[in-house]
Amino acid sequence: MTTVVKHFLRDDDLTPAQQAEVLELAARLKKAPFAERPLEGPRGVGVIFEKNSTRTRFSFEMGIAQLGGHAIVVDGRSTQLGREETLQDTGRVLSRYVDAVVWRTFGQKRLEAMASGADVPIVNALSDEFHPCQVLADLQTLVERKGSLKGLKLTYLGDGANNMAHSLMLGGVTAGVDVTIASPEGFAPLPWVVEAARARAAETGATITLTGDPQTAVVGADALVTDTWTSMGQENDGLDRVGPFRPFQINEALLAKADADAVVLHCLPAHRGEEITDEVLDGPQSVVWDEAENRLHAQKALLVWLLAQRTGDRP
């Protein structure tokens, strides 16, 4: 048995070919939810939430059950994560109990520290910097609506420094999608993430565009994406997270500038009337409910794929 441990801490942890394999498997599992049962036994997956969650918790718990396994769910208050022992040591210990660890946490370095000691896959269920499982679901949704991903134009509008913008850049260009990030002054993506995304884009032929003009950013776009203007933990950061963002709201007028067949995505929860209007969120071009469902299928596919890397079995 091979013992390769593959983690999914950020979107570019998957090569373009590996990402395509996961998305293909996600489509298969959506049609046949119980076709893969690698956790039969049941075997366990540790699921740790240091940040509150609705979609992530429901989709991972149900997905693990459909894969034949048992989710051991804990929150940050009921563990000693990073307090009584190093995160590396925690990774070593948890590897003796479970087959994978799914962790929704704060700083990315916490995930990297645990992964450095773990002998089982560590999955980023959301960090301050990245939200890679969500972007797998977004890409699955785009495949369903658009077919091929390569060459699609995706425009994200909002806080360019949030985890969705970062993951859309990394995951999008990995799939060959041309990604535009439109954000107000002072809210651009972190430079080191842009550098990593441009490096991956150079491999796939995709492009990355950063702009402060939402009107030109959406012209001809195949997909518009937004997220809340105030992410968890930013409620009291002292920044004006309303006024500068108003021009970046996805409304019917802005959507009309995109391609006639453009789709609209939002990872949810949505602040209706802020980053997106009711008319767009509930309108015919919105695919947010399919996108939310696809969290289940994409995450199941990811777990199946990661577990197979350890055993050498092909899902």
Curated annotation (Swiss-Prot):
Q: Which UniProt keywords apply?
A: Amino-acid biosynthesis, Arginine biosynthesis, Cytoplasm, Transferase
> Cross-referenced HAMAP family, in alphabetical order?
OTCase
Tell me if Lipid metabolism is a UniProt keyword of this record: no
Which subcellular locations apply to this protein? Cytoplasm
Q: GO terms for CC? A: cytoplasm
User: To which protein family does this belong?
Assistant: Belongs to the aspartate/ornithine carbamoyltransferase superfamily. OTCase family.
Question: Which SUPFAM superfamilies does its entry note?
Answer: Aspartate/ornithine carbamoyltransferase
Catalytic activity line of the entry: carbamoyl phosphate + L-ornithine = L-citrulline + phosphate + H(+)
The family database entries (NCBIfam families) matched by this protein are listed as: orni_carb_tr, PRK00779.1
Name assigned to this protein: Ornithine carbamoyltransferase
> What single Pfam family name could you report for this chain, choosing any that match?
OTCace_N
